[in-house]
């Protein structure tokens, strides 16, 4: 059972936004790790 959430992330450095699960990863645009979840997306 895959219970990973899809979260709308925003990078604090370059302000890029993307959808991803709640694992630790860096911004796909500028590679900055200073990211924050913008809002959780419910199924």
Swiss-Prot record:
The source's domain of life comes to: Bacteria
User: Gene that codes for this?
Assistant: yotD
Q: Which organism is it from?
A: Bacillus subtilis (strain 168)
Protein name as annotated: SPbeta prophage-derived uncharacterized protein YotD
